[in-house]
A protein has these predicted regions:
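Amphipathic, Lys/Arg-enriched alpha-helical "gate/interface" segment within cytosolic domains
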Residues: 1-126
């Protein structure tokens, strides 16, 4: 399951339990919309509640990251499970992404908000 919310710094995404291809499609749609609205939107990806992911989702995720490697600003990832963290780091090695990893949401949000003046705000192009 996935929840996606627009924030002043970009998108805040929380993954719950299993991250499926259907969840990724929702994320992809939100990310593409954010790219249209703001140059280099920031992303907070909270994986602390994620327990597993499907292989088809992982393949689509890699494809998307390769296609849009230079379309995003900062990416903050919240994760506490060592295996999920290793998997995320491996995926980022394949895609040239350089996210920063955090243990808590507050610190991650603060880091993303520091970059807001450089990346714009979601919905500011109205």
């Amino acid at each position: 399951m996935i929840s996606i919310h627009e924030q002043s710094y970009g998108l805040s995404v929380v993954l719950h339990n299993e991250f499926t291809l259907e969840d990724f499609r929702q994320l992809e749609e939100a990310l593409l919309k954010a790219i249209e609205q703001v140059q280099f939107p920031n992303l907070l990806l909270d994986m602390s509640q994620m327990k597993d992911f499907t292989v088809d989702m992982a393949l689509e995720h890699l494809r998307f990251l390769r296609q849009h490697a230079h379309d995003f600003g900062r990416t903050a990832i919240i994760v506490d499970d060592i295996w999920i963290r290793l998997g995320a780091r491996f995926a980022n090695l394949l895609t040239l992404q350089r996210p920063k990893y955090f243990n808590d949401k507050h610190t991650a949000q603060k880091w993303l908000e520091q970059n807001v003046q450089n990346s714009g705000v979601i919905g500011s192009n109205n």
